[in-house]
Amino acid sequence: PIGPPSVSYIERALKDAARRQSPLLILQLDTPGGLDASMREIIQLLMTSPVPVVTFVAPSGARAASAGTYILYASHVASMAPGTNLGAATPVKLGGVAAPGTPGSDADNLSSPGGSDMQRKIINDAEAYLRSLAQLRGRNVEWAVQAVRNAESLSAEEALQKNVIDIVAAHVPDLLAQLDGKEIKLIHQTQVLRTSGLTIKKIEPDWHTQLLSFITNPNVAYILMLIGIYGLIFEFATPGTLIP
């Protein structure tokens, strides 16, 4: 899932790519979604990067759901492998909220007097954000709205047909072949990618990122919380047994 470890990892990868003067950075993505704050941090990093970022949803069977859809839209080049999907970009609270179009949800009718003001604000904000990314990158604005409002999803082939992504590639060498000669817009300039004969260097997560990923894993966090709660109960029940 997208979270603080993802931000740390991508920031380090972008700095490394800039230091090496790499012609591009391929961000391989497979995510069910994640935290809104972390997603926005990542998008800011991508949009201000001096190195072109090509997000590649891969391998086959991977997905760029929810927050992953926003990251894909924000990338200089959006690409997917066959058999992958994206979408379902409706924001939900950590506790869970009914998605638009489901029974009991008033997200479809934002003027409903019984609707949640906070829910309307969250959905409107998310829609405007994804719409702005679509306009910036010249991608399908109408579908971006539907992905937020109605949690719509697309396969890789459908996304290519609807101008949601730029490329469908079977693997990284195929992706590089299709990228060669492609013109992209960076912050202050336009750049033509020259990807023929490039050597691929994989950037692995460092120990700091791996530790953060372990600690912030929901299952691990829940276990640590239980250990803390039971530790407090035991200490209150038998004070001084473990700690004088």
What are these regions (language model features)?
Residues 215-244:
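Core alpha-helical transmembrane segments of integral membrane proteins
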Residues 1-213:
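Soluble extramembrane regions of membrane proteins in the secretory/endomembrane system
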